[in-house]
Amino acid sequence: MKTAFTLIELIFAIVIMGILAVVAIPRLNATRDDAQASTAAANVSVAVMDITSYYTAKGFFTDVKSMSNIVIDDNGNMKVKNTDCFRITVSNATSSEVDPTKGISVGSPILKVVAISSSDNACLSAQRLTRSILDSSPINIGQGNVKFN
């Protein structure tokens, strides 16, 4: 009766573990990308709410970075996995941005969320998850005349 593993049995065990690793590692990476995409999509929604609330409370714009607690760089870009994925800007509407169906006239305060071209899978997934926000941009954020001092 033998009490130890043979070399063949050890080699088979190592081969099986290698096959499992080849299958499992890409799945783990995909799961991580999905989590980052979900987080980014939630952050875009929160940034839109933060900026809208800021404008409602103050009645004016500052830079986008200071109007939200979401991490946005000085250019208004949000990153997913260190890749610029979204650009958020605020401005007053120009004649080319007038949209009566959204209540946007010349000079209306608007918020724009634009997808930045990327090949990163997490970024592309985040852009798909935020499609409704991207499609509704520009967003009129000054429809009311209420100001809080």
In which residue ranges do the predicted regions lie?
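N-terminal single-pass transmembrane signal-anchor helix
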Residues: M1-L28
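Generic structural signal for short, solvent-exposed loop/turn connectors between secondary structure elements
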Residues: M1-T3, D34, K65, I141
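Generic intrinsically disordered, low-complexity segments enriched for polar/acidic and small residues
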Residues: K2, E9, I51-T52, T83, ...
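Alpha-helical protein-protein interaction elements
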Residues: L20, V46-A47, N140
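Membrane-proximal N-terminal amphipathic helix
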Residues: A35-D63
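Periplasmic/extracellular, small/polar-rich flexible segments of pilin-like filament-forming proteins
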Residues: T56-N149
